[in-house]
A protein has these predicted regions:
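Positively charged n-region of N-terminal signal peptides that target proteins for export
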Residues: 1-4
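Bacterial N-terminal signal peptides
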Residues: 7-18
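Amphipathic, positively biased hydrophobic alpha-helical segments used for protein targeting
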Residues: 18-19, 254
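Sec/Tat signal peptide C-region and signal peptidase I cleavage site
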Residues: 21-24
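Beta-sheet-rich non-transmembrane sensory/scaffold domains
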Residues: 26-672
């Protein structure tokens, strides 16, 4: 994911999917649809046995036919009727605490369990992450558990005590297993549940996702518990996060390329899990994905563009991690989104030039309660998870006919012509159904091709705009945003701005747009960061504006921003920025929201000598791919996480000023 070659993104020009009446919009041309019974009320079929799966893979991937970029889909039909999937069984209650948390392989459960999510409208007091769906936590670099902030940074975990009036470092520990070699591994994100700290990473050396478990002890100490290694391809996305947490259930998505699948060694390229131990070998891996939990649909697979998309759920309620996994077969290009009760995986391939308008995508719905997945054929692709919303029995997705999904840096390529797809969940079925042409709403006024798309569903609205460019920027005006009620066929509102749109986020029921007025990244001192508030009421309109000169965002991921409402109309927001102070000093900027009137509320900055601090001895995961700064609102206290500094603020005449700071730079090199 962090290899240099991956940054060189392909930008192939794709052909139109649209009917002539709507230009190049992502609306598919009229096509013969299967009977309604073929879609509604049905689900995908799993393979009936390991033998059937292996035979299907041999037919699909074993052909010696010449390789064509636009190969026709190859049906994967069973030789005999497939037995229905076994009904989901609840995962047994967590085992009683075991005295020995040693290195024996934990039992793998391939069964279902209904996830108990926190009640809507009552976010936890420990919530400090700007998540997409309330009650669905997302992996990040800092989490709160009781009095403690847990920070994941440069291959280590740190616990910081903020209880009472304290601000002190308590404990630090390697983010990997003692005695293991972390070389060529990236420890990206973290979650916390009832004293269990979960670190998610990816190892190029071992070829899989790593899940590290640590105990947060009563006094704030950190203790290593276990490491699990899941064979997978790289999950990295410049915008999305690999892991989610609902209650005590860990959910993570991992793709698995089948490009090197060997029909005579099928287990070598399928998801498997091992509990790491000293001296672990490949033989320790155990399949957690039986063929009877792999689903497909006739006609959706291309032998030259196929991957296995796996969703794994693990229960964290006991000393042993219990996991189950299911997967769908689809095209390699993907975007995934987690709602409160399902994981959606959107896969797509290049359009077929011989059949313009033929659906080139499929969206899979994988319920979190253990029921079989379902699917719907579609056209185009979303650019990231923020392009999705499941609500009130509908799925809404903003798609582009040139978009290539979110893998690696694909979200930062052109989107092409845009459309809003809105379909009922009841339309998902056995994979033969096609989204109706009428389900797409073309958005021709928003077709800006060579700029990054940023979008978010907020209340009843979809708000989006365009920021940094990657192609030809001449003559393109990106200083505008678009807003529409996604459930209504009302005109799209075009909002004139003083800046491009590099972030869309929520201010309670309303919106904020953030971006710069220049795209010359070498001229930071002449750039200005704009904040524009939008009122989303009877109509969408610009309500307020704030200008911060000589600054740019230091992190464009969703987690860089946080808004704390004080009541229905007022609140405080924080955003990491890089200021023009001579050496690119980092800080968290705070703004006050008063009925959508935005005003400066101070900043908390890193120390002047932060860039010249002692060597931290980093040996692994030494690039901050997920950023290194966050605004943190914990109760009535306000902090800025800035690298190895935690700066606490206090209110002074309506502004946030520094009260004190904690430097938790490690004093010893990371052990290996």
């Amino acid at each position: 994911m962090k290899s240099l070659f991956a940054a060189a993104l392909s930008a192939a020009a794709l052909l139109a999917l649209a009917a002539p009446t709507v230009g190049r919009a992502a609306t598919p041309a009229a096509a013969a649809r299967p009977p309604a019974a073929a879609a509604a009320g049905k689900t995908l079929k799993p393979f009936a046995s390991e033998r059937e799966f292996r035979r299907a893979m041999a037919r699909l991937l074993g052909s010696n036919a010449s390789r064509r970029h636009y190969a026709p889909p190859v049906p994967v039909a069973p030789d005999a009727p497939v037995a229905p999937a076994a009904p989901a069984q609840p995962v047994p209650a967590p085992l009683a605490a075991a005295a020995n948390k040693g290195t024996t392989l934990d039992r793998i459960q391939v069964t279902g369990s209904r996830i108990q999510s926190p009640s809507a409208g009552s976010p936890s007091a420990d919530t400090i992450t700007n998540v997409q769906t309330q009650g669905v936590d997302e992996g990040d670099i800092v989490k709160k558990q009781g009095d403690y902030l847990i920070v994941l940074r440069r291959g280590r975990l740190f616990s910081l005590d903020t209880g009472g009036d304290r601000l002190r470092a308590v404990s630090s520990i390697d983010a990997f297993a003692p005695g293991s070699d972390p070389s060529d591994t990236w420890y990206d994100e973290m979650l916390v549940a009832d004293g269990t700290v979960v670190v998610i990473g990816y190892s190029y050396d071992r070829g899989g996702t790593e899940i590290g478990l640590f105990d947060l002890q009563a006094g704030g100490g950190l203790r290593y518990r276990a490491t699990y290694q899941l064979r997978s391809s790289d999950y990295y996305s410049a915008r999305n996060y690999a892991s989610r947490l609902i209650g005590k259930t860990l959910i993570f998505y991992a793709p698995m390329s089948l490009e090197d699948y060997e029909t005579d060694r099928p287990d070598a390229r399928l998801p498997a899990l091992r509990h790491w131990r000293s001296g672990a070998t490949p033989a320790d891996f155990r399949r957690i994905l039986p063929a009877t939990a792999i689903y497909t649909a006739p006609g959706l697979l291309d032998p030259h563009d196929v991957a296995l998309h796996a969703v794994t759920q693990c229960e964290l309620g006991g000393p042993r991690m219990r996991c189950r996994s299911s997967a769908v077969l689809g095209a390699d290009s993907r975007t995934f989104y987690v709602s409160e009760d399902a994981v959606y995986v959107w896969t797509s391939r290049d359009p077929d030039p011989d059949h313009p308008g033929r659906p080139n995508a499929a969206v899979f719905r994988m319920p979190l309660d253990g029921r079989p997945p379902s699917a719907l054929r579609a056209s185009g692709s979303p650019v990231d998870q923020m392009s999705f919303l499941q609500r009130d029995g509908w799925l809404n997705v903003l798609v582009g006919n040139d978009a290539e999904g979110e893998a690696m840096w694909a979200s930062r390529t052109r989107t092409g012509d845009l459309a809003l797809l809105r379909v009922r969940l009841s339309e998902f079925g056995d994979g033969r159904g096609i989204a109706h042409r009428a389900a797409y709403r073309p958005l021709p006024q928003a077709n800006i091709y060579d700029y990054d798309l940023h979008a978010r569903f907020i209340g009843d609205w979809l708000v989006f705009g365009f920021g940094g460019y990657w192609g030809d920027k001449d003559g393109v005006d990106v200083k505008r945003a678009f807003a529409l009620r996604y459930a209504r066929r009302e005109p799209v509102s075009t909002l004139r701005l003083a800046h491009a749109v590099e972030r869309v986020d929520a201010l309670g029921p309303d919106a904020i747009l953030i971006g710069t007025d220049r795209d010359d990244e070498e001229q930071v001192s002449t750039r200005a960061l704009h904040f524009t508030s939008l009122r989303l009421g009877a109509a969408a309109r610009v309500a307020g504006h704030h200008l911060q000169t000589g600054a740019t965002q230091s992190d464009d991921r969703t987690h860089g921003f946080f808004y704390r409402p004080e009541d229905a109309d007022n609140g405080l927001l924080g955003l990491p920025v890089i200021a023009d102070d001579g050496d690119g000093g980092a800080r968290v900027l705070f703004l006050r929201n008063r009925r959508l009137d935005l005003s400066a509320a101070g900043a908390l900055a890193s120390s002047a000598d932060a860039g010249r601090r002692r060597d931290d001895g980093c040996v692994v995961s030494c690039v901050d791919w997920y950023g290194d700064a966050r605004p943190i609102f914990a109760g009535q206290r306000v902090y800025a996480l800035l690298g190895y500094e935690l700066v606490e603020g206090r209110r002074d005449g309506g502004r946030i000023v520094e009260r004190r700071r904690l430097d938790f730079t490690p004093r010893a090199k990371v052990s290996r």
